[in-house]
């Protein structure tokens, strides 16, 4: 089916399957003008969009941090304003991932850690997206992951095919970091769980346009099955739709939540 062709790898079980994991479904970003009439009422001020979003979903992936990392005070503000039970994942800055390609990460690791403290109980996962021209470098990835405190949950999204290797999975497992499961636009879909949690990014089913198209009901049922399996194995799952065009991400996230038996407050 569209959006989930790839390789199904199984990995060691790091979790207690005697209890189910928690599932959070949301979108990548929230401040889109073209979501008016889909998620936001017409004329809703931009400053009110996150609160409106958080009344309907329990997680979001912050993408603006990739382009400009927020101040620690901004993270503290989100901690105060977001409702109880809400969790925000944050995309690592491109200066670290694309500019330096994880080289000499100490300054960024300290800054991220300080902001993670400020986000407090609203923090979810740090997404580290590596660029497509960054080929496999185990030593550099190992050094970067070791530079972060172990209590920060990290997921790594690889775009170069050389990273698809058992040695890389073992490295992630040693650090408790999650291999980012991807869907869409020719990206490899590897169903590999390397941490006590699973991180999924759904970039859209259009084979030619990244972030394009809307997942079919069959696609979403397939993903509900995979997420249900991870949940039954005791793994927490964070899944974010990145096909924001036309509000497809909102609709797909709501449908997937319903398929997983998650109540919808709207």
Identify the function of each model-found stretch.
Residues 1-266:
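Residues lining hydrophobic/aromatic ligand-binding pockets adjacent to catalytic sites
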């Amino acid at each position: 089916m569209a959006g989930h062709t790839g390789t199904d790898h199984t990995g060691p079980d790091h979790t207690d399957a005697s209890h189910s994991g928690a599932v959070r479904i949301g979108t990548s970003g929230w401040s889109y003008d073209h979501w008016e009439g889909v998620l936001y009422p017409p004329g809703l001020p931009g400053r009110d969009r996150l609160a409106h979003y958080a009344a309907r979903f329990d997680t979001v992936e912050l993408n603006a941090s990739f382009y400009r990392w927020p101040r620690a005070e901004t993270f503290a503000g989100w901690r105060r304003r977001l409702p109880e039970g809400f969790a925000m994942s944050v995309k690592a800055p491109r200066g670290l991932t694309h500019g330096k390609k994880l080289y000499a990460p100490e300054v960024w690791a300290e800054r991220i850690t300080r902001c993670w403290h400020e986000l407090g109980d609203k923090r979810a996962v740090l997404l580290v997206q590596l660029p497509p021209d960054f080929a496999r470098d185990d030593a550099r990835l190992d050094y970067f992951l070791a530079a972060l405190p172990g209590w920060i949950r990290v997921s790594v999204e690889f775009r170069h095919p050389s990273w698809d290797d058992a040695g890389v999975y073992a490295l992630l497992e040693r650090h408790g970091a999650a291999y980012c499961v991807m869907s869409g636009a020719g990206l490899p879909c590897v169903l590999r769980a390397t941490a006590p949690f699973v991180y999924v990014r759904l970039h859209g089913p259009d084979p030619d346009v990244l972030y394009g198209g809307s997942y079919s009901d069959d696609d979403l049922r397939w993903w509900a099955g995979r997420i249900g399996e991870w949940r039954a194995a005791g793994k927490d799952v964070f899944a974010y739709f990145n096909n924001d065009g036309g509000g497809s991400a909102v609709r797909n996230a709501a449908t997937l939540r319903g398929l997983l038996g998650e109540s919808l407050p709207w």
